[in-house]
Amino acid sequence: MAAPSVSCGAAVPYRLFLAGRVSFAREQGLWKAAASGLQTGTRCQILRLKHSPAVTTTKNVAALRRESYTVDFIKKQIEEFNIGKRHLANMMGEDPETFTQEDVDRAITYLFPSGLFEKRARPIMKHPEEIFPKQRAVQWGEDGRPFHFLFYTGKQSYYSLMHEAYGKVLHAEERQDQLRAKGLFSEKSKSKDLIGSRWLIKEELEEMLVEKLSDQDYAQFIRLLERLSALPCDAAEEEFVGRFRRTVTVQSKKHLIEPLQYDEQGMAFSTGQGKRKTANAEAVVYGHGSGKIEINGVDYLLYFPVTQDREQLMFPFHFLDRLGKHDVTCTVSGGGRSSQAGAIRLAMSRALCSFITEDEVEWMRQAGLLTTDPRVRERKKPGQEGARRKFTWKKR
């Protein structure tokens, strides 16, 4: 049987062209031939050339590790801040060794007075750690592999913390089951006392973890901590929960309550000052009386003809159920009738604090009786009829 014939006129030139292409590609190291050669037959069969991409053996680790603010950058900024603070202290005639941040702020306000309403737009000179945000250090090695197994979750610190908290929950539940099996478990020791403290808010937790969290993530974490705090905890678990609690100071304790004073007749009295808008008031509240109130030597019914102003004066006594038990003498100046009534009410409320308990003082603070009203009259705007009112627009 005769061998199959091959048309050399067409096959040879193409074979030479392909051989040259394969040999050139082998030199470049980019192409590989999957067979030893070309097959001859009725039709020339050409094997497909496979492309294998070149693998980069050296990685630009510096580019992968690029940080917004490096450690060297922060150190340089701190050095410049310390030098600038010493120069500022010398300019103000102060001792550079005892020049505090409060002195720096006061000096900047004096040297660079600004009338800008937005405080963030005013000139400042703060420590670099307060100016530049915290950032996470590099989380992978020279080979490009991350150190933490939760790196690819995008929130490795958050999920690691959730794992740790849930592990403590399981440990506390196991200990609770053991106590219940021995008959030593009591409901009184079930929960941890959290009075006087609060959980970290979302922004504080983000600053601690140096990660952005969603509201759902934050709520889930707080629910897990509340579940842990409801279980009988040992010292280590209480310390873990305490890391995410902040002590809340009772606001009423910040107010300085003056002790009671006594006059020549031995009657107890207390004084208080109040202010609202441009009105200033001073009140003297006596311990025993019939409910008589004098303002600048005039009875309050004659001084304030408007019922609303009278109700403002009587509200502190009505709130404490002390109507008709105290006599009050007030002096007030400046402002209008409404602002004078507010200033007198604040002065009387502060004076009453000397006659009541700490709990009642806290109730008054929560009711707003011990808080100064910061509202003032809004200034007129140029090009307008008033603070908000515009001129009447006329087409013609």
From Swiss-Prot:
A GO MF label: structural constituent of ribosome
Compartments (UniProt record): Mitochondrion
Subunit and partners: Component of the mitochondrial ribosome small subunit (28S) which comprises a 12S rRNA and about 30 distinct proteins.
Protein name: Small ribosomal subunit protein uS9m
Source species, domain of life: Eukaryota
Record GO cellular component, one term: mitochondrial small ribosomal subunit
Record-linked Pfam families: Ribosomal_S9 (PF00380)
GO BP annotation list: translation
Family: Belongs to the universal ribosomal protein uS9 family.
Region feature (Disordered): 374-396
NCBIfam families: PRK00132.1
Keyword field contains Nucleotidyltransferase: no
Annotated keywords: Mitochondrion, Ribonucleoprotein, Ribosomal protein, Transit peptide
